[in-house]
Swiss-Prot record:
A Gene Ontology BP annotation from the UniProt entry: DNA-templated transcription elongation
Function: Necessary for efficient RNA polymerase transcription elongation past template-encoded arresting sites. The arresting sites in DNA have the property of trapping a certain fraction of elongating RNA polymerases that pass through, resulting in locked ternary complexes. Cleavage of the nascent transcript by cleavage factors such as GreA or GreB allows the resumption of elongation from the new 3'terminus. GreA releases sequences of 2 to 3 nucleotides.
Molecular functions per Gene Ontology: DNA binding; RNA polymerase binding
Name of the protein this chain belongs to: Transcription elongation factor GreA
Length: 157
């Protein structure tokens, strides 16, 4: 089984969601029991809704448990900063053409949130940055075409 990289923050988010779902599980079972008491199950909307909710909840629990079982949690704060872009590092880029500064943290696929500055390790930008060093100039293929960036800072935060 291949390990999937995940930040400490990503692991904590998954564990919090798993805890929430595990607390929800008995409530759904109660709703099913109450709906059963209402009689005929063929035309019992409450029963069918609760069963559907149970199926969704169980699927989410299995999904999170699987993700946690294959996760390789990487805590970059415990690593020596060598200036090299690695999984979990926070990279500040300067657009060579516009001098615009952008900062991204390279995270696992499930943790990515571009609005929060977290990009997936498998995104074109991250793939173009991994292994490069602070001060390097890189050409990255973006949806708008190739762009040149300078790696201004690499932080392990």
């Amino acid at each position: 089984m291949e390990k999937v990289p995940m930040t400490l923050r990503g692991e904590q988010m998954l564990r919090t969601e798993l805890e929430r779902l595990l607390k929800l599980r008995p409530q759904i079972s109660e709703a099913i029991a109450e709906a059963r008491e209402l009689g005929d199950l063929k035309e019992n909307a409450e029963y069918h809704a609760a069963r559907e909710e149970q199926g969704i909840c169980e699927a989410q629990i299995r999904d999170i448990e699987y993700k946690l079982s294959v996760a390789q949690v990487i805590d970059v704060t415990k690593m020596e900063n060598t200036g090299k872009v690695i999984f979990g590092s926070t990279v500040t880029l300067i657009d060579v053409d516009t001098d615009e500064e952008k900062t991204y943290q390279i995270v696992g696929d499930d943790e990515a949130d571009i609005k929060a500055g977290r990009i997936s390790v498998s995104s074109p930008i991250a793939r173009g940055l991994i292994g490069k060093m602070e001060g390097d100039e890189v050409a990255i293929q973006t949806p708008g075409g190739a762009k040149d960036f300078e790696i201004d800072r690499v932080e392990y935060i």
